[in-house]
Amino acid sequence: MSEKRSLPMVDVKIDDEDTPQLEKKIKRQSIDHGVGSEPVSTIEIIPSDSFRKYNSQGFKAKDTDLMGTQLESTFEQELSQMEHDMADQEEHDLSSFERKKLPTDFDPSLYDISFQQIDAEQSVLNGIKDENTSTVVRFFGVTSEGHSVLCNVTGFKNYLYVPAPNSSDANDQEQINKFVHYLNETFDHAIDSIEVVSKQSIWGYSGDTKLPFWKIYVTYPHMVNKLRTAFERGHLSFNSWFSNGTTTYDNIAYTLRLMVDCGIVGMSWITLPKGKYSMIEPNNRVSSCQLEVSINYRNLIAHPAEGDWSHTAPLRIMSFDIECAGRIGVFPEPEYDPVIQIANVVSIAGAKKPFIRNVFTLNTCSPITGSMIFSHATEEEMLSNWRNFIIKVDPDVIIGYNTTNFDIPYLLNRAKALKVNDFPYFGRLKTVKQEIKESVFSSKAYGTRETKNVNIDGRLQLDLLQFIQREYKLRSYTLNAVSAHFLGEQKEDVHYSIISDLQNGDSETRRRLAVYCLKDAYLPLRLMEKLMALVNYTEMARVTGVPFSYLLARGQQIKVVSQLFRKCLEIDTVIPNMQSQASDDQYEGATVIEPIRGYYDVPIATLDFNSLYPSIMMAHNLCYTTLCNKATVERLNLKIDEDYVITPNGDYFVTTKRRRGILPIILDELISARKRAKKDLRDEKDPFKRDVLNGRQLALKISANSVYGFTGATVGKLPCLAISSSVTAYGRTMILKTKTAVQEKYCIKNGYKHDAVVVYGDTDSVMVKFGTTDLKEAMDLGTEAAKYVSTLFKHPINLEFEKAYFPYLLINKKRYAGLFWTNPDKFDKLDQKGLASVRRDSCSLVSIVMNKVLKKILIERNVDGALAFVRETINDILHNRVDISKLIISKTLAPNYTNPQPHAVLAERMKRREGVGPNVGDRVDYVIIGGNDKLYNRAEDPLFVLENNIQVDSRYYLTNQLQNPIISIVAPIIGDKQANGMFVVKSIKINTGSQKGGLMSFIKKVEACKSCKGPLRKGEGPLCSNCLARSGELYIKALYDVRDLEEKYSRLWTQCQRCAGNLHSEVLCSNKNCDIFYMRVKVKKELQEKVEQLSKW
């Protein structure tokens, strides 16, 4: 809280004729218009008795009830509605949180166990003698009844393939046995056996003959990598076999190898038949699961995730959030700063309401309707009890917002500092300690991010921040910004420096903090449900076959690898271990037909290829297994077009007559499965099942589209530029062929009213102007043209008419906007692509102005109104009337830069100035301020700019942010000259702050007259002698200005109170993603300045 300044009481006499509308009583009070202070009137002009005066309550709760009854926030009302769910739970009774007990008569010889496995990991199970191996894969899961399971799958040996030596004695079993003995002497008895098998390599077509391979089984899974290295580097010396090194095959992790061979996919159901599994004895159990069993891998039954086995078990999902009490000016550090509250919300997958809502608090806390409060005298006790709560509740999924990089590591480090030794054991394995591992995740699709990984065995972790960063491109990823974007609501955002004040207050202020903390725990659960994060990732794990945990920790390639291994297993095919390395090889991308730029006030029909790249791969049989060369063609006497084709870029692939490729088979299955899922989705009525089916069809679509990218990844598991470049080459020829076919058929010469013109084409679509002004006619022609062009290409390539644009503004390649129509009666939306209005690296003002301009031009057809709005915006920028929140630019912080970047320089400055700053992967908000320094040195934190009265660089925002995007929109309509003319500004005066040195050191600063701005003489008041005669008039105007600002500040204050849901307490919110916050700070600053000016009268 800022220090209050006491101003003297002053009585002022005002003539009736000067202020007929005002009362004659004016008094001056002390004021504190800090961000966290209530809008107490400084100049109280009392027009009537109905004027309300607010009294500041500070941080301590008062007995005075200003509003009659305490108002609850919307969130508290939600909690109140849930209250009946907790009627049967006694306060402080953890037993009510436990899972349903197992039947007392449970007998493994009488009951099958079917469970949905949610996590898998390799481990060692002592005391199990199953085919001389103690290595197991542990599957954690949940039954349909909600019982937790740990299933140890035993007996599976890891293996790799090598080509059998090209030697006469390579098939001699005695020689093979000697080689096994040699390997065991070399690798400490790590080899179990060698089996001779017939396989084909996935790489290249050389005929249909299978070749001999050795399948080498190892005793310990980790020995595969050592053995693989020895084979590939030629370190083995036996009968001259492999002395020059050889390629090894099927390089895949042990856990995934078992899942592939057993037909288990991620998040699928497994059945353990009665009599085939054994219960782990109580004294040998290592987990807290209700059922802990072991089974040989040959005896388990894996169910495909379809039909009756597509449902989801009643998974327990726990969302939590913590609050820490930091020191002044320092971001909380676990070595010094306590955890003061932990809020928890627990729900069942598919349920509408959470069945547990509680807060663990340090010190007392007033009750919260619909929630349980567990108060503790010491932090050690709170942390220990929270850990016990986790064990009792036994969540299957732990979610939150930034829990991976902050909450969980902070709790572990804090418990370590306090020596709470039992705390880091809240996973499902009793003796496995939770530990932090720091890493850097980097991929082309997701960028580079610093992350911390904590092993919580048996419990899935789904950090909604990481999920949203992967799946959505937003300007800001704060919980506030994300909630506003997806849920349409804001939340109070209390700065960490204020949290200590609330904690050190009383039980009421701690209650306010608890409600805040509880909402931060509840929002991730709502976001997960809204975005179907758990459902979509479950279906992605099922479709691609990988464990759920891979989806957040790994990139895209492992998903395709898993599908390839599964299909190869079916058809006796092995995959070579390719040495992944960067390559400079490039291939030509998709064709973009040169756009005919302009504004089209006639319908533009858009023809789209349905799943273009997957369709090309299927139609032309493009695959690793079908790739061949000229020598193979000659050796096998293959006939062109019948046995093989030459792609547009010169690569050879055999046709389906010779062999159907694995990739086309996978794609065909994915697309067919998606059609089935979409059909089931249309027929399904149950909302949760609909969500599951929708998640499945999305996962199938994404998986099909990622296969092409997998082949083109030069740094990857199995790159093949012959495939990826052939796909894009076919795509280019198809786009050009479509253009030619449409323009040749739909022309006046063939009896049509107009000559059709393809105005633009990009990757998988072409935009056609048929010439008609009638929208329905254009849509009918588009449908007809799509059917006609589809006949020119091989199945399953299909061109569809999906939409028309009318009107249509074509600016450049990959940049256009238009009204989007799927039926002629009503447009669907205003669609944009590639414009600054949908980009994240420009300020929101650009998006606001462009959207408004496009709306006026395309929807209202009011070009003059659009131009007037642009001129008005330019004027507002020049006169500093644009709210600073609209000028914020946001960019992601990368680890390294060749040249200084504004946001990176600011991040370092913030760390030096405030002790804490953005991390790699975070988005940094900044504005550009005035001055003559280099641009990267003029990036500044928006709040710092407001608080220190620093002026932004108007010219930068006009020329570097707004000018080019707006000109690109209006120039096609009004011409380049007039469009550029709107941004011609002769001069802009920018206040860059005080200057020192040079001539400035001889200049003395003096006060200026509040009316004429002339210099004041010593001893003169706010007005110079020339303006003194107008003192009364000017004073009344100043009073009006102050009153207007007070009224505005009160409205903003009330708006913030309503958002926080508490109209009787201080506004503590510092949400930097909220326009109201910046407006409140700015008005507060202006009000303080006006009050100080008025005090000089």
UniProtKB/Swiss-Prot annotation:
Effect annotated for changing C1009A: Impairs iron-sulfur-binding
Keywords annotated in UniProt: 4Fe-4S, DNA replication, DNA-binding, DNA-directed DNA polymerase, Exonuclease, Hydrolase, Iron, Iron-sulfur, Metal-binding, Nuclease, Nucleotidyltransferase, Nucleus, Phosphoprotein, Transferase, Zinc, Zinc-finger
EC number: 2.7.7.7, 3.1.11.-
Reaction(s) catalysed (UniProt annotation): DNA(n) + a 2'-deoxyribonucleoside 5'-triphosphate = DNA(n+1) + diphosphate
Cofactor: [4Fe-4S] cluster
GO cellular component entries: cytosol; delta DNA polymerase complex; replication fork
Record PTM Phosphoserine, positions in chain: S30, S37
Result of altering C1056A: Abolishes iron-sulfur-binding
Function recorded in the entry: Catalytic component of DNA polymerase delta (DNA polymerase III) which participates in chromosomal DNA replication. Required during synthesis of the lagging DNA strands at the replication fork, binds at/or near replication origins and moves along DNA with the replication fork. Participates in leading strand synthesis during replication initiation and termination. Has 3'-5' proofreading exonuclease activity that corrects errors arising during DNA replication.
Family, as annotated: Belongs to the DNA polymerase type-B family.
Name of the protein in question: DNA polymerase delta catalytic subunit
The organism of origin for this protein: Saccharomyces cerevisiae (strain ATCC 204508 / S288c) (Baker's yeast)
Lineage: Eukaryota, Fungi, Dikarya, Ascomycota, Saccharomycotina
This protein's encoding gene: POL3
